[in-house]
Curated annotation (Swiss-Prot):
A Gene Ontology BP annotation from the UniProt entry: killing of cells of another organism
Keyword Signal: yes
Comp. bias (Polar residues): 303-313, 460-474, 727-736, 1021-1030
Compartments (UniProt record): Cell outer membrane
Signal peptide residues on this chain, from the entry's feature table: 1-30
Disordered as annotated region, ranges: 296-315, 452-488, 716-737, 971-1030, 1168-1199, 1437-1469
Protein name (database record): Hemolysin
Highest taxon of the lineage: Bacteria
Listed SMART domains: Haemagg_act (SM00912)
Listed GO MF terms: catalytic activity; toxin activity
Biased composition (Basic and acidic residues): 478-488, 716-726, 977-996
Record keywords, A-Z: Cell outer membrane, Cytolysis, Hemolysis, Membrane, Signal, Toxin, Virulence
A GO CC term attached to the entry: cell outer membrane
């Protein structure tokens, strides 16, 4: 047996205790009215007005009176019963008289039995006095009322046990084995009927019953019968038997009842009924029990103060405090006009208010719930004083709900009878009908409500920023409390298992029926909100730095569930129906069924989590900034199932719609019966998991190349990181204004949508899919930098300072993918049925009239959008500086001031002799490298069918991939067993690698009597790959034509058939292709490079050293292929019909009528190919050596050196381009072929126009070729450099020895060569023409034109063997050469031009600027040898013999003129080459740089080999053909020009072709000096050329001829 414990609030417990105490003490006071002993006792009297009086017994004769007692108590001066037979007054015993025991008979029942052993105690009132009767008090030893009542009653009974009386009648009451109590407390009053019959009722105050008028304006009414356990009752509280009990008694009603019928029964069996506070019935309110409990009243309140400037000491204190807490409620009201609470176990309503007009709540478990109340606040303050502190505490908590209210005013029934119906945040209403019925489940939830807040605290030295630490905040907020059902006309939820909605609100304003017998769950409740921040600080205790934090946030909310009607919405269940993100509507339509499983219209999801764990710092709390996080977001709620009329979803397993919305507004019907229809998308996710940190000091001002600069300061430490995962997509929709989907397995769209807003759409099943949906991102990102600092340098190559460091690391990985599509949008016709397979993937549709696909085949595909990236980089640094360099005097005076603004003067005397000197030193380097990059991408997404008719049926393949049909108002029909239209691509790839290097060292002075170390390094690796491919194509356009009709093959790839305003028909039965579509590209590179070097040093007086080495290799490769084509159009013509073969590849066929290409084996028209390729390869190297030494006190010597360097490069190019096909027409062009080979009609460079032409090939022949474009090059180049140096020098003595005849020897050699060769082979023709104005060539083998051209105004046909008209050629061979040589020698002395203009005064004044530039170049070569010996002694007269005197300070000597002797000098040739061009222009300005050089060569050659179009058969009103064997011609032509050429008698055979065209080349440039052959013959005569060679040639003659001309 179940025990129910009724929990009282603290106030309730106090009230109960007081009632017991009062009852006990009042019992002591009320021990009065005793009677009994014989003939049923009474007498008893007191009055004047301590009331009592009684007198009654006598009647029976069934006016019963039957009193007995031994005790019975009343007091507070009440009682009187008398029942009169006159005298008068009373209202508690004023005056009185009559009774003596009523021999003349009144009564009509007054019983009062007790018969000893106490309780009764009633503490006031009872009167009857004259006539009106019915009153019973029976006792077995309970009853205590306290303020009790009655007076002249019309039926009041309080019983607790016994009388039944039989033949003297009464016949009611017993309560069998009895366990006492009926206890009421304060105010009872009564009037018409009140029976409270016990074991156990304990009511606790106010029971007021009224109505009762009589004497005899009869009324009575107002009733209360509250009967509790053991029973056998009647008189007419009926019950008539029951027993069981030992233990569990319950029944208290805990304050107030009024009446106009209230009838509360508890007939034990686990007992029950406890209500609390007011039942009011203005007509009927019944409660029956084995449990029913209804609760309210929670009081509680509290507070707690302190303050008033609390204090402690020693030197510091204050602690403030306020606290509070409270709850209050007092509700429970049940009013009346038919309310019935029945429970035969449970029925539990907690914060109750139930009003009335029909309301039945039953039991066997039914719970409407609520209550929880708690409010509490807080506040503490805490402060302290020495070494300051300040604490704070704040709290707050509210959790509130209250729940339950059922208000009907016309029907509402909530029943369970055996288990469930719970409503929780309830509020049920109705204004005629609402019914919830269970016997397991029906759930509907709600409640929650919270609001918490907190703050903690503690700081210590507090502020002016001596802050110290600890803090904590929190904030939590949830709310909800829903659950509402409301009616105003019909609403039924019924279960038998399940129906559960959670964020409920269910409304109907007629019809809303939810039925179940397993399932229907219309979801979501969830709520949360939270926040937390922690703080941790420090300022001066962290010497000015601090901060940490520990943030958080969490937010889920979802709530929905709203089912609303306004007319029809029926959801049925029977093992299915789940709507989760909720809302379902009706407004006169709906019905969702799932009789035996399926249907789920999903989404909800809500998560937000943010965590961060920050930190700042600096100064000695260092860090300065960090941030972690652990983000996560999902959201989405959708699910809306609507109708503003018609919506039917039936299912018997499956039929999911997941991102949701299903609407209507006129028929939408979705069915499954048994299996599938899924219309998906939804998935939502985002995780990011960040880390950040930074410590930065900065500074800087940059550019540290070319003209140089840099500034400085930098400390850096950065570390970022991110992980990202993102998956979005939400869609899903099926709308209405007509849509029908039916399955019996399959029908899937995935990125979703099918709308049809006002007219047609239907999709059936066994596989139909429209697919896509992706949206993805995944990412890893990392960055690490470490850092370093200090710097300044300066400009145009150095000033100084240094120190740096480095390290950097970047990683990126990313993937992505987008696509989401699926489609349609209709508004008139769309029919897709497939009883196996129709799959579209990039689908979009949008219809607007017809578009139908019926299947067992059909694919349409594409869809992609994706991307991928991998980037990795690692770098190192290091640098140490100090400087002044002055880059060997500022880059030889910035390359001799732009080679003196390009007038050059031999590289402004070789950049002023390479200047040289300043330096101070130290640089140590190091760099780093490594990198990787990969990238990939792919777009495409196609499929699209816009419509206004398109019709595709298949029972075997139709597969497009670059699809897009569009047909806006008319045709495109395709019936199949094959048709395939491929293309679609868009891809790009890329890979790379980069590995670098470098090193350094430079230690220098010039001159701190010297030292040099120089060393270098370098590194290598590069690699790269790339690839690309576009194409996408596809399309069939139409507005009124195209009609493909296939039973095997018809394959297009560069597609686009148009059909505008009529016809384009393709009809296969084997083959028809239109191929090509390409766009490709590829590339690959590779690398390597290495270098090294070293240098050496010392002087006072010198040593040197050198070294070198080098590196190279590189590779290449490239490729491409473009073409695309496709296109065939309409305007009432074009028909292609095959039946095996018909291939166009360079397609583009137009029309304004007729064009028919047929086959039955082969018709070809090929070409279209485009391709290019290029290869490369490089190899290079160099080597340098060196040595040195010298000695001095005056000289010894040394030196060696060498050089090197070569590079070899090779490229190998190629190209092929052909295009071909294009047929135009403005009337007839028919090319037919019917097999039997020799190439049953085949055109290759085709063009064909129209206004008639028909080339057939009745069983073999016709070729008409060309189109061949090729090109090839085989380029290479070679470069060689060399060098050498030399040395030796002796002298010494005056004790330093070495002389051996005092050496010298010095040299500088050179060399050099560059050769570049480009070769080429080229072949070109394109021909095939046929232009028309009549042309017919039939063949039955042979007819072959090979380059081709038929022009026409007539040319007729039949060949039947031979007729070749050839021509072709076009060949070009190429060669193009460039050579650039060199040569040099020197024999040093600074390789003068006066030792390179004596290095403009440095190293240290360069021999006093080479003795003032060799004394004004020997005083301008002795005043130009005395004005060229006074103009060669006036143009010779045997010339004067007196020479000039010259002086050289450097050699300390005077040179006198030579004394003539012997023969006189030879005279003119003019004057011996103007005395060998001015002493070779004064030994090319004073001294060595002996022999220099150059030679440049260019050459071109082309070769050609001719024709360049001919081939012909022309026409202009003649040529009739009928050949039947031979005609040949080879150089071409058969012509007419206004008449004749017939060839019915054939033979003819002519040849001619020959050809030629040649071009030529030349050019050499020379010098190896005499002023660079006088300034490159004044720069090749200021670039009008010729001096020093040239050339060219040309040859033509091109022939082709051959013949038959007639009318010419």
């Amino acid at each position: 047996m179940k025990n129910n414990n009724f929990r009282l609030s603290a106030a309730g417990k106090l009230a109960a205790a007081l009632a017991i105490i009062l009852a006990a003490s009042a019992g002591a006071y009320a021990a009065e009215i005793v009677a009994a002993n014989g003939a049923n006792g009474p007498g008893v009297s007191t009055a004047a007005t301590g009331a009592q009086v009684v007198d009654i017994v006598a009647p029976n004769g069934n006016g019963l009176s039957h009193n007995q007692y031994q005790d019975f108590n009343v007091n507070q001066p009440g009682a009187v019963l008398n029942n009169s037979r006159e005298a008068g007054l009373s209202q508690l015993a004023g005056q009185l008289g009559a009774n003596p025991n009523l021999g003349g008979r009144e009564a009509s029942v007054i019983l009062n039995e007790v018969i000893g052993r106490n309780p009764s105690l009633l503490h006031g009132q009872q009167e009857i006095f004259g006539m009106a009767a019915d009153y019973v008090l029976a006792n077995p030893n309970g009853i205590s009322c306290q303020s009790c009542g009655f007076i002249n009653t019309s039926h009041s009974s309080l019983v607790v046990g016994n009388p039944l009386v039989e033949n003297g009648v009464l016949q009611g009451y017993s309560t069998f084995g009895n366990r006492n109590t009926l206890s009421l407390n304060g105010t009872l009053n009564a009037g018409g009927v009140l029976d409270l019959i016990a074991p156990k009722i304990d009511s606790r105050g106010e029971v007021i019953v009224q109505d009762f008028k009589q004497s005899n304006g009869k009324v009575t009414s107002a009733a209360i019968n509250a009967i509790s356990g053991l029973n056998r009752v009647a008189r007419d509280g009926t019950v008539q038997a029951s027993q069981q009990m030992p233990t569990a008694l319950d029944s208290y009603y805990l304050g107030s009842m009024q009446a106009g019928r209230i009838n509360i029964i508890n007939t034990a069996q686990g007992s029950g009924v406890k209500l609390a506070g007011s039942l009011n019935a203005g007509d009927e309110l019944k409660v029956k029990a084995y449990d029913i409990r209804s609760e309210s009243r929670v009081d509680d309140a509290s507070s707690n103060k302190n303050g008033g400037d609390n204090y402690q000491n020693y030197r510091g204190g204050i602690y403030v405090n306020d606290r509070s807490s409270s709850q209050t409620l007092t509700r429970t009201e049940l009013k009346g006009k038919n309310i019935s609470l029945v429970a035969d176990n449970h029925a539990h309503l907690t914060a109750t208010d139930i009003r009335g007009e029909d309301i039945t709540l039953q039991g066997g478990k039914l719970t409407l719930d609520g209550q929880q109340l708690k409010q509490t606040q807080g506040h503490t303050d805490d402060r302290w004083f020495y070494s300051w502190q300040y604490d704070v505490t704040r709290e707050r908590e509210q959790l509130q709900q209250a729940g339950s209210t059922v208000a009907a005013s016309g029907s509402a029934k909530l029943i369970s009878t055996q288990e469930d119906v719970k409503l929780l945040g309830a509020n049920v209403s109705a204004d005629r009908a609402l019914s919830v019925k269970a016997a397991r489940d029906v759930h509907l939830a709600g409640l929650v409500e919270k609001d918490k807040s907190s703050e903690r605290g503690y700081q210590r030295n507090h502020t002016s920023s001596l802050r110290t630490g600890r803090w904590s905040n929190s904030d939590e907020s949830e709310s909800l409390k829903a659950s509402e059902l409301r009616s105003e006309g019909e609403l039924t939820l019924k279960a038998g298992r399940n129906v559960s909605t959670q964020g409920a609100k269910v409304h109907a304003q007629r019809d809303l029926t939810i039925d179940a017998d397993n399932q229907i769950q219309v979801g979501v409740q969830k709520t949360a909100n939270a926040k937390a921040v922690r703080d941790d600080k420090t300022s001066w205790g962290g010497i000015g730095g601090g901060d940490n934090k520990n943030n958080s946030n969490r937010r889920e909310i979802s709530h929905a569930s709203e089912l609303t009607s306004g007319g029809t919405l029926r959801l049925n269940g029977q093992q299915g129906v789940t709507i989760t993100g909720s809302k379902a509507r009706g407004q006169k339509g709906g019905e969702v069924t799932a009789t035996h499983g399926g249907l789920r219209i999903d989404n909800a999801l809500s998560t937000t989590v943010d965590k961060i764990d920050a930190r700042t710092g600096t100064a000695f709390n260092i860090t300065s900034s960090s941030h972690k996080a652990d983000n996560s977001y999902q959201s989405s709620t959708a699910s809306e199932l609507k109708s503003d009329t018609n919506l039917t979803l039936v299912s018997h397993k499956d039929a999911d719609v997941i991102g949701s919305q299903v609407a209507s507004g006129g028929e939408l019907s979705v069915e499954s019966k048994t299996g599938n229809i899924n219309v998906k998308a939804a998935e939502r996710q985002q995780n990011i998991d960040e880390q950040k940190t930074a410590l930065t000091v900065n500074g800087y001002a940059k550019e540290a190349g070319d003209k140089q600069y840099r500034a400085g300061l930098r400390i850096e430490h950065t570390r970022d990181s991110e992980k990202t995962t993102r998956t979005e997509n939400s869609a899903s929709s099926l709308s209405g204004g007509s849509v029908k989907l039916k399955a019996e397995k399959d029908v899937t769209f995935s990125g979703s949508k099918l709308v049809a807003d006002k007219g047609d759409a239907s999709v059936s099943g066994n596989k139909v899919s429209f697919l896509a949906a992706d949206d993805k991102t995944a990412s890893n990102t990392e960055q690490t930098k470490i850092g370093g600092g200090f710097y300044y340098t300066g400009g145009i190559d150095k000033l100084g300072s240094g120190v740096e460091a480095g390290y950097e690391n970047n990683k990126t990985q990313a993937q992505s993918s987008k696509a989401i599509t699926s489609g349609s949008d209709v508004k008139g016709n769309l029919t897709i049925n497939a009883r196996d397979k129709l799959t579209q993937q990039g689908a979009q549709h949008s219809v607007g009239g017809a578009y139908q696909e019926n299947a067992a085949g059909v694919d349409h595909l594409a869809a992609a959008d994706t991307a991928s990236t991998t980037t990795t980089k690692t770098d190192v640094g290091v640098n140490i500086g100090a400087n002044v360099d002055y880059s060997a005097v500022t880059r030889p005076v910035e390359r001799a001031v732009g080679k003196a603004a390009k007038l050059d003067a031999t590289g402004v005397i070789n950049d002023i002799g390479g200047i040289g000197a300043p330096n101070v030193g130290l640089d140590i380097g190091a760099q780093g490298g490594s990198s990787e990059k990969r990238s990939s991408s792919s777009q495409a997404v196609v499929s699209s069918v816009q419509a206004g008719s398109i019709d595709i049926n298949a029972k075997g393949e139709v597969r497009d991939q670059g699809t897009q049909y569009q047909a806006s108002k008319g045709a495109v029909n395709l019936t199949a067993d094959s048709h395939r239209s491929e293309a679609a691509a868009n891809r790009q790839d890329e890979q790379s690698r980069d590995t670098r290097g470098s090193a350094g060292v430079r230690v220098y002075t010039t001159t701190g009597s010297d030292l040099t170390v120089d060393a270098k390094g370098e590194g290598g690796t590069q690699r790269s790959n790339s690839s690309a491919s576009q194409a996408v194509t596809g399309s069939i356009d139409a507005a009124n034509g195209i009609n493909v009709n296939v039973k095997k093959d018809a394959i297009y790839q560069g597609t686009a058939l148009n059909g505008g305003r009529g016809k384009t028909a393709v009809n296969a039965g084997g083959d028809i292709r239109l191929d090509q579509a390409s766009d490709k590209q590829s590339e690959s590179r590779s690398g390597f490079n290495v270098k090294a070097s070293a240098k050496g040093g010392f002087t006072a007086d010198s040593k040197n050293f050198g070294a070198g080495f080098g590196g190279g290799t590189h590779n290449g490769e490239s490729s491409s292929s473009t073409a695309q084509v496709g296109n065939i159009s309409g305007q009432q013509g074009v028909e292609l019909k095959a039946g095996r073969d018909l291939t166009l590849q360079g397609t583009d066929v137009k029309s304004q009528g007729d064009v028919s290409l047929s086959a039955g084996n082969k018709v070809a028209l090929q070409a279209a190919e485009s391709t290019q390729t290029r290869k490369e390869s490089k190899l290079s190297g160099n080597i340098d050596l060196g040595a040195g030494s010298s000695d001095s006190k005056e000289k010894t010597g040394g030196n060696l050196s060498a050089g090197g360097a070569f590079d070899i490069a090779k490229v190998n190019e190629s190209a092929t381009e052909r295009q071909g096909a294009t047929i135009a027409s403005d009337g007839k062009v028919t090319l037919s072929a019917n097999g039997k080979g020799d190439d049953a009609l085949h055109l290759q460079g085709a063009k064909v126009s129209g206004g008639s032409a028909a080339l057939e090939a009745k069983n073999g022949g016709i070729l008409l070729e060309s189109a061949k474009n090729e090109q090839h090059k085989d380029n290479w180049s070679l470069g060689i450099k060399a060098n050498a140096k030399g040395g030796q020098t002796f002298n010494k003595d005056a004790g330093g020895k070495v002389d051996p005849n005092t050496g010298k020897d010095t040299h500088t050699l050179g060399a050099g060569l560059k050769v570049g060769v480009e070769q080429q082979d080229k072949t070109t023709h394109a021909n095939t023409g046929i232009t028309a104005g009549d042309v017919t060539l039939n063949s039955g083998k042979d007819t072959r034109l090979a380059g081709a051209r038929v022009d026409a105004d007539s040319v007729q046909g039949k060949v039947g063997g031979d007729l070749h008209v050839e021509s072709r050629k076009d060949v070009e061979n190429g060669v193009k050469v460039d050579v650039d040589a060199g040569l040099s020698h020197s024999n040093d002395p600074g390789s003068s031009i006066t030792s390179k203009l004596s290095k403009v005064g440095t190293p240290r004044y360069a021999g006093k600027v080479k003795e003032k530039l060799e004394a004004g170049v020997n005083k301008v070569a002795d005043a130009t040898t005395d004005k060229y010996n006074s103009v060669a002694r006036r143009l010779d007269p045997q010339q004067d013999t007196t020479g000039a005197v010259s002086f050289s300070k450097a050699e300390g000597k005077v040179t006198l003129p030579a004394t003539p002797a012997g023969e006189k000098p030879q005279g003119p040739l003019w004057d011996r080459g103007a005395r060998t061009v001015g002493g070779a222009v004064k030994d090319s300005i004073t001294g060595p740089a002996g022999r220099q050089g150059h030679l440049k060569v260019n050459a071109d050659v082309v070769n050609n080999n001719a024709v360049g179009e001919q081939s012909a058969i022309a026409g202009k009103n003649g040529v009739a053909l009928q050949v039947g064997g031979q005609t040949q011609l080879t150089g071409g032509e058969i012509r007419s020009q206004q008449g004749k050429v017939e060839l019915g008698g054939s033979q003819v055979s002519q040849q001619d072709v020959n050809g030629q065209r040649y071009q030529g080349g030349g050019r050499v440039d020379a010098a190896a000096t005499v002023g660079g052959l006088l300034g490159g013959a004044a720069k090749q005569s200021v670039a009008g050329n010729v001096p020093f060679a040239s050339g060219h040639a040309s040859t033509q003659q091109a022939d082709a001829k051959a013949g038959v001309f007639s009318g010419k």
